[in-house]
Design a protein with these regions (language model features):
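Short, small-residue-biased leader/transition segments that mark boundaries at the very start
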Residues: 2-3
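Gly/charged contiguous loops adjacent to phosphate- or pyrophosphate-bearing nucleotide/cofactor binding elements
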Residues: 6
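Short, charged/polar, low-complexity loop and linker segments
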Residues: 11-20, 130-137
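Glycine-rich, flexible loop segments associated with nucleotide phosphate handling
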Residues: 15-26, 174-179
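Alpha-helix capping/hinge segments and adjacent helical runs
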Residues: 20-98, 185-208
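C-terminal amphipathic alpha-helical interaction region
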Residues: 90, 106-209
Length: 209
């Protein structure tokens, strides 16, 4: 949707805004999903135990292939550093804040957790941007920052799924509610964990690795 607007919107301002969102989200999406692919393939291998390494199953090849994607086109850690130090902090997160607000506009009056987590994210970004005492702190937080932003974007995507489903089929809630609940139960709690890690690091001026 955003990529389409970046190319085909009739409004130059909307095209420019969409292009900024694509630039910010590209390292997030690359890192988030290649890491998830590796972890998913590894989990499949673990289910089979030692037999998962037998070539005829093919899982061991998927594990290797998925691992390569975390290195290809810039390692995920470099992508995280690029996101935070080159795309977010130079303007203290102002562009990110503007873009997140635009994405949240369709959900005014609904999805309070999405809005609350966005506000908490902006406060964290401001805190990182105004830390002069540790020149390496932003580098150390970059991986958690990228992962946390990616999880927020996944939360946003689920809100769009819900909205589109109800527009197309008002009675079709069951079609998306189960996977959405699974996301809320198993995936979204990691966002809070990442926030806690970064907030503790900022409070103590060190990172627990």
């Amino acid at each position: 949707r955003v990529l389409f607007r970046s190319k085909h919107s009739a409004s130059p301002a909307e095209r420019a805004q969409a292009q900024r969102w694509c630039a910010l989200s590209t390292p997030v999406l690359k890192s988030l999903f290649t890491q998830q692919a590796f972890e998913g393939a590894s989990a499949c291998l673990q289910v089979l135990g030692g037999h998962g390494y037998v070539r005829e199953w093919g899982i061991e090849q998927h594990v290797r292939d998925a691992r390569v994607t975390m290195i290809y086109e810039g390692t995920n850690e470099i992508q995280a550093i690029d996101l935070l130090l080159r795309k977010v902090l130079p303007d203290a997160g102002a562009a990110l804040r503007e873009l997140m607000a635009a994405e949240l506009a369709p959900f005014q009056g609904s999805h309070p957790s999405l809005h609350d987590s966005a506000q908490e994210w902006h406060a964290l970004t401001q805190h990182i941007a105004t830390q002069p005492s540790s020149p390496t702190l932003a580098h150390e937080l970059a991986d958690d920052y990228l992962r946390g932003l990616g999880l927020w974007m996944m939360q946003l995507a689920w809100a769009h799924v819900e909205r589109a489903s109800l527009m197309l089929e008002p009675s079709g809630q069951a079609r998306w509610s189960d996977p959405q609940q699974a996301f809320q139960r198993w995936v979204w709690p990691e966002w809070r964990m990442r926030m806690n890690i970064m907030q503790d690091a900022l409070a103590n001026q060190k990172v627990s690795l």
